[in-house]
Amino acid sequence: MSMRAIKIEPDSDIREVEITGESIEEQNDSIHGYLGGYFDVVRMGRDACMLVDDEGLLKALPQNTLAMMISGYPLLVGTALIVGTREGDDGDEFCDAPERFVKLAAELNGAAAVWEEEQA
């Protein structure tokens, strides 16, 4: 099983990625691979959250301005992942990122491509 997520880098690179794993443990391993370790959850409404490196400040990771703008959170560092959330048997569980974030990533990438073309 895989789930769609949106990865946001500190340099404002934003793209769709896949979180893999049949079990929660395997999915967490996949998330750790993207973020570099354990993660904290930043809630973004009922159906989405942003996952960030739990020790990002201790690791002196760079500020992620785009993730801060999208989440409304005052300080985020390092890589961030947006995933969906839904109610499960044991509380909330992760699922595909909501479509509005997939569209946002596509729109931002399109705008960046146009800007890069104009700069060339």
Predicted features, each with a name:
Residues 2-120:
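Domain-length accessory/inserted modules outside core catalytic folds
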